[in-house]
Amino acid sequence: MSRTIVVDHLARIEGHAGITVVLGGDGVERVDFNVTEGIRLFEGLVCGRHCIDVPAIVSRICAICSHGHTITALSALEQALHVTVSAQTRTLRDLAYQGANIESHALHVFCLALPDLLGHPSVVSLAGANPAAVGMALRLKKLGNTIQEIVGGRAVHPVNYVIGGFGRLPSTDDLLQLKAALEAGLNDCAAALALLRTIALPAFVNEPVRCAALIPRDEAFFFGDAVRLSDGFEVPVDKYLTLTNERAVAHSHAKFSLHDGRSYMVGALARLSLHGDRIQGAARDAWNAVGLTLPSTNIVANNLAQFVELVYSVEHALEIVTALLAQGIADEPPVRVEMRAGEGTAATEVPRGTLFHRYVLDADGCVVAADVITPTAQNFSNVEDQLRAAVRDGAGETDEVLRSRLEIVARAYDPCVSCSVHAIRVL
């Protein structure tokens, strides 16, 4: 006799999704991660539009990831237009990515995931029991927003990034403000570490995690030109379709990805598993203190990996700002752009994993084809594999216990469902 476990609405994630699991006499018969978010046709929206309009449009794919979508789109368009940006522009974009990482990871680790690990139903309940922890989390989130606002013009849906550079460059006063805020942020990271090092991860998950991430370019941890999987497969960014292999499934408004017939995960856990040797300083100390062991067979460890990256981003952002103050901001205009036909593909590591943007332009600079593949869409197949692992030995557990397990595992990926349903799909 079969038994069905249903999570109608997965709380504490971005967007709308649910879970259906069918258990039978022979184990887990079916697992569906049901993405019910309304379909949003961004790739169709940009076709026919001039390339100058594209970054502002695709930033609306997601508010939390808006800077990542904007900069990844700019990088792809600059490749198509044969535009090479300055070292200063690359540095400032790197700084913006640190801000995005701080904001997103602070929100997820402390407000969305931590209630699970401390036995609270919500961040509101957690705030009542531990207001200092939630206050610290919100200060870190504000720090990330401040960085993005200073570099991108707005914390959400930036207006300052343009093809070839920036509309306005940060002032010395802006950088001094950031430096003080980042120094305070390191103190908040230390307070957060004191809390996280006391938390034990749930033991019901024990399943190997196949990881994928960009191979970092020089010291830029979130930028690269090729993707590596933990089983050794490597692919240049412009051949990304050989990795993602998107497919439609009946139970989801988003597409799912498989590589070589198997799922993989992207995100903080994948980045540290593949390239964690680049993490040093306070972030390495935090890694050791929380007891993060990689490679991990516990997907919930992604929450700890996100915290390690958060510390890295605060520390690295402070290094960038200190260097910019020492050398000064060069008053450089954006690179001059001449419209031409071309094709460009770019990938960056946004908080939830590897993000791909591809655009084909005509001779006037208008978009004739577009493709965006988000981290969460790549993760969906792996989510289902890990959900299966979480309940396969749970025949003797109550429905309530199994629902809790399913929610904890799904939330560990920090899914951004609005990003995942960006694509055109024929229904």
Where are these regions (language model features)?
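Active-site bordering "gate/hinge" segments
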Residues: M1-T354, T374-L427
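A translation/RNA-centric and nucleic-acid-associated enzymatic feature enriched
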Residues: R352, H357-Y359, A369
